[in-house]
């Protein structure tokens, strides 16, 4: 029995029968469109003309020859023909073209489908197949791959994540078990880092919110242990409705809304961690009624007290501002239902149902809740948690009930803590979940608060600060009412900023005060600080200027009021710009933060290093702090203003890109970058008490400040900062090719660059009907074989053609000509898109795609020389030399094959 083969023979057999008219009633219907007519079965009892089914009988015999004999019992005469063509997609029936002749015979019209042929060198080359050429366009248009070494553990973790994306969520781990530290695809998982490190400092870092990773369920929420910290979704994205409704177990249902069971962040859920909003939170009231969250000792608040989540992001605020007040103290234009609800038509959560007795109508609407409670909290991002006003910890109450904190070994204001030992009830992770705590009496005297505790005391601790933001009221989504009270930021042009700043261990932050800025008399009465905070230094503490930041109708205004003038009226400088618009949401939250910069000594002429910036050395006499003010908006950075040794109080124009020119060399990073740097320090740096011992045990080369430089083996996946050429446009254009053999022009080819279209192959002779060369991705320049009289030269030329294989791949777009040396023959090309390499012959790289011609440079050159006629080509298009390096760009008689490629429009203008 012959071996079963493919179905290519069927197309060839049909085309041969049609071209030679081998069977009656079997002919072309439209040859150009590959349409042919075959006789249809006649009804029973009708007269069958002679030879009506001859084509089907011959086809059955050919099938028996190729595939072997087959039984014909129960098979119609035309059944095998139709099954083979339909099953192999060699042809399709065109029922819309069925017709009958004058003798009553009915005909079925088929249309051949163009397919590749095995005997085509271009379709199935020995060394180059269609798959390789199809990958070429992806390699050409994609940026270079990262060469960063990947650790084996990272590769294993990635395989786990890929396997877990399609797997169901594993069973919940017991609370006593501790998960293995892992890193997300984009940023460090802070909770995992704090699990292993002694100094547990919780900082919020965005994580990869794409497909579900290992250990995630269908909602995308990873089941984590108590060691893992919470994460926050992108502000402004609406939480998707959850499928969890009516839970019977309060710990298995994520609660967090009035009338639902409380969350259990110890080992089950991660609040507000993914696009689904508050992860694991039931979107409908549960059957358990209003349950208060558990205390750390296991007790609960009275069930009559509604549980208001203290961890909703800014983008979920009902309206603009912190708490715009109505007559009853509730937010304006918000009808207070009994439970929180999600409005599918509005991209925000509406948290209502707050009793008016728990609100403070007398408080200014724009002041942050934590500012009303006492001071400021260290690190936040745009998705920072906010505590409702009614449930704010008051003076002396433990702040860790609302925000995570880290212990520094000192006696905290909210409980005792010793070095190396976590407080009771927090195990050893030192990451405190969001749980309300009963009020406790304030500690007698002054006690240094922990990094994230609130402190009603005015004196800040003398410890190394961490970058802290200066808050600004967020801008809402759709409605942007005018902020009633501006935010005054003390600003100094001489000694230091004013003491109106409230300090914490996490850094210095502005505690806004309503109304007009303080007068110089008020500023004089404020005592100078002896802290190591870089914002305040010894000496003159007189504020010489104030910066007022307001938002009105979607515009950001920065007003500088200079108090140093001689006149009674202070000078005012106002800079205003509309806030940018991003996506379907009209506005997103805007955060103004002050990135701490080290002191700058005028006598030292060097820019501070990154470690120096992190060290935040307190400026002394003769030194001035540099605190640039930056607005982080929708992932972009805008310079709002700042001063340095050479700058005045007038801020630069808003909307300028953050470059070294407008910030005078100051390295300002985004929230993610800044927090990532802090994380790198925390990961590499042990606790303060054991750092010296660690340094003695590991004598290595240190930085000037005694801190190891963090080294990351596998960083986040980011696009390359600089491309070696401009990426091509998606629009394909026609191109013209001139072919030279040993320096003599032998022919000109013109090809139309239709995107995504393949061309009919003309090999071996003439047009092969029904053949589609699928290797034509991208444009494949098939150079015809040419001959020369010299046998020696002809032998070299044949080797070049064999090395070229089926063609030379090029990609022509509006931006230029791109190619890659996907051939076996050695090649050179002339010039480079970079003017630095102009008129230099460069060898092809077998792996890197290259730009042979830059349209922008050509147009710039022609515009610079308007008198030069277009017939003179000032910039040579893509010229490729195959087989030998030319003696010069003008003399290439020694090159066996030369190809000059022009973009069609440029060729038309030149000739």
Curated annotation (Swiss-Prot):
Region ranges (Disordered): 147-184, 211-302, 494-537, 681-727
Presence of the UniProt keyword DNA-binding in the record: yes
Compositionally biased region (Polar residues): 222-231, 495-505
Ranges of compositional bias, category Low complexity: 211-221
Gene Ontology process terms (BP): symbiont-mediated suppression of host cytoplasmic pattern recognition receptor signaling pathway via inhibition of IRF7 activity
GO cellular component, one term: host cell nucleus
Annotated region of DNA binding: 7-114
GO molecular function, one term: transcription cis-regulatory region binding
Residue stretches of biased makeup (Basic residues): 697-710
Chief place where the protein resides: host cell
Intracellular or extracellular location(s): Host nucleus
Keyword Cell membrane: no
Keywords: DNA-binding, Host nucleus, Host-virus interaction, Inhibition of host innate immune response by virus, Inhibition of host IRF7 by virus, Inhibition of host RLR pathway by virus, Transcription, Transcription regulation, Viral immunoevasion
Protein's job: Plays a role in host cell apoptosis modulation by promoting TP53/p53 ubiquitination and subsequent degradation and thus down-regulating TP53/p53-mediated apoptosis. Works as a potential viral transcription factor to modulate host gene expression to build favorable environments for the viral lytic life cycle and greatly accelerates the induction of an immediate early gene RTA, early genes ORF36 and ORF57, late genes ORF25 and ORF64, and latent genes LANA1 and v-IRF3. Inhibits host interferon-alpha production by interacting with host IRF7 and preventing IRF7 dimerization.
Quaternary state and interactors: Interacts with host MDM2; this interaction facilitates the proteasomal degradation of TP53/p53. Interacts with host IRF7; this interaction prevents IRF7 dimerization and subsequent activation.
Family indicated by similarity: Belongs to the IRF family.
Name listed for the protein in its UniProt record: Viral IRF4-like protein
Biological classification of the source: Viruses, Duplodnaviria, Heunggongvirae, Peploviricota, Herviviricetes
């Amino acid at each position: 029995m012959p071996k079963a083969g493919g179905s290519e023979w069927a197309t060839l057999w049909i085309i041969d029968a049609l071209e030679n008219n081998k069977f009656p009633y079997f002919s072309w219907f439209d040859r150009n469109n590959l349409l042919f007519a075959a006789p249809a079965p006649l009804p029973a009892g009708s007269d069958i003309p002679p030879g009506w089914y001859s084509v089907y009988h011959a086809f059955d015999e050919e099938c028996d020859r190729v595939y072997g004999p087959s039984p014909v019992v129960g098979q119609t005469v035309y059944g095998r023909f139709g099954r083979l063509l339909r099953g192999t997609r060699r042809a399709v029936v065109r029922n819309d073209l069925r017709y009958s002749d004058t003798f009553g015979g009915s005909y079925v019209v088929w249309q051949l489908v163009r397919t590749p042929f095995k005997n085509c060198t271009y379709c199935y080359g020995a060394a180059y197949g269609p798959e390789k050429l199809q990958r070429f366009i992806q390699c050409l248009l994609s940026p270079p791959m990262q060469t960063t070494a990947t650790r084996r553990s990272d590769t294993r973790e990635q395989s786990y994540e890929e396997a877990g994306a399609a797997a169901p969520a594993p069973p919940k781990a017991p609370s006593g078990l501790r998960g293995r530290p892992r890193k997300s695809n984009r940023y460090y998982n802070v909770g995992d880092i704090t699990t292993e490190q002694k100094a547990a400092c919780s900082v919020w870092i965005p994580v990869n919110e794409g497909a579900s990773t290992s250990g995630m369920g269908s909602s995308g929420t990873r089941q984590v242990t108590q060691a893992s910290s919470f994460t926050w979704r992108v502000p402004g994205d609406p939480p998707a409705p959850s499928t969890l409704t009516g839970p019977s177990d309060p710990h298995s249902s994520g609660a967090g809304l009035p009338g639902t069971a409380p969350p259990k962040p110890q080992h089950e859920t991660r609040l507000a961690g993914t696009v689904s909003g508050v992860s694991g939170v039931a979107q409908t009231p549960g059957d358990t009624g209003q349950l208060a969250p558990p205390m750390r000792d296991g007790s609960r608040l009275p069930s009559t007290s509604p549980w208001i989540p203290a961890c909703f992001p800014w983008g979920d605020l009902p309206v603009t501002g912190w708490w715009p007040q109505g007559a009853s103290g509730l937010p304006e234009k918000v009808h207070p239902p009994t439970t929180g609800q999600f409005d599918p038509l509005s991209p925000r959560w509406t948290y209502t149902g707050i009793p008016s007795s728990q609100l403070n109508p007398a408080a200014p609407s724009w002041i942050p809740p934590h500012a009303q409670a006492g001071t400021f909290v260290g690190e936040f991002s745009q998705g920072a948690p906010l505590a409702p006003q009614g449930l704010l910890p008051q003076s002396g109450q433990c702040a860790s009930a609302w925000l995570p904190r880290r212990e520094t070994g000192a006696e905290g204001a909210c409980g005792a803590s010793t070095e190396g030992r976590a407080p009771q009830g927090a195990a050893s992770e030192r990451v405190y979940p969001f749980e309300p705590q009963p009020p406790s009496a304030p500690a007698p005297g002054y006690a240094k608060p922990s990094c994230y505790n609130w402190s009603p005391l005015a004196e800040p601790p003398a410890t190394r600060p961490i970058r802290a933001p200066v808050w600004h009221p967020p801008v809402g989504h759709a409605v942007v009412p005018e902020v009633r009270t501006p935010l005054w930021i003390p600003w100094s042009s001489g000694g230091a900023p004013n003491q109106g700043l409230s300090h914490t261990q996490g850094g210095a932050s502005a505690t806004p005060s309503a109304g007009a800025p303080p007068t110089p008399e008020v500023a004089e009465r404020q005592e100078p600080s002896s802290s190591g905070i870089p914002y305040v230094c010894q000496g003159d503490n007189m504020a010489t200027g104030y910066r007022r930041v307001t938002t009105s109708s979607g515009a950001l205004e920065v007003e500088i009021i200079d108090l140093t003038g001689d006149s009674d009226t202070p000078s005012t400088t106002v800079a205003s710009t509309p806030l940018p618009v991003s996506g379907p949401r009209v506005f997103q939250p805007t955060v103004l933060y002050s990135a701490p910069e080290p002191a700058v000594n005028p006598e030292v002429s060097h820019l501070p290093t990154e470690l120096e910036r992190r060290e935040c050395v307190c400026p002394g006499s003769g030194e001035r702090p540099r605190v640039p003010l930056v607005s982080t908006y929708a992932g972009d950075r805008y310079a709002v203003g700042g001063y340095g040794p050479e700058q005045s109080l007038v801020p630069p124009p808003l909307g300028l890109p953050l470059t070294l020119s407008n910030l005078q060399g100051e390295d300002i990073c985004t929230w993610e970058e800044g927090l990532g740097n802090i994380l790198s320090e925390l990961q590499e740096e042990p606790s303060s008490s054991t750092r010296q011992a660690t340094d003695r045990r590991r004598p290595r080369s240190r930085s000037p400040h005694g801190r190891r430089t963090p080294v990351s083996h596998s960083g986040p996946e980011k696009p390359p900062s600089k491309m070696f050429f401009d990426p091509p446009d998606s629009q394909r254009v026609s191109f013209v090719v001139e072919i030279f053999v040993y320096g003599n022009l032998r022919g000109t080819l013109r090809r139309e660059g239709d995107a995504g279209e393949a061309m009919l192959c003309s090999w071996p002779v003439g047009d092969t009907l029904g053949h589609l060369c699928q290797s034509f991705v991208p444009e494949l320049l098939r150079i015809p074989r040419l001959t020369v009289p010299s046998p020696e030269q002809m032998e070299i030329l044949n080797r070049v053609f064999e090395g070229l294989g089926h063609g030379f791949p090029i990609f022509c777009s509006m931006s230029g000509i791109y190619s890659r040396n996907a051939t076996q023959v050695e090649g050179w090309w002339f010039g480079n898109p970079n003017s630095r390499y102009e008129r230099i012959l460069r060898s092809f790289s077998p792996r890197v795609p290259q730009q042979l011609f830059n349209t922008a440079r050509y147009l710039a050159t022609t515009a610079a020389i308007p008198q030069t006629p277009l017939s003179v080509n000032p910039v040579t298009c893509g010229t490729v030399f195959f087989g030998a390096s030319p003696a010069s760009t003008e003399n290439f008689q020694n090159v066996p094959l030369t190809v000059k490629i022009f973009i069609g429009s440029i060729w038309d203008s030149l000739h």
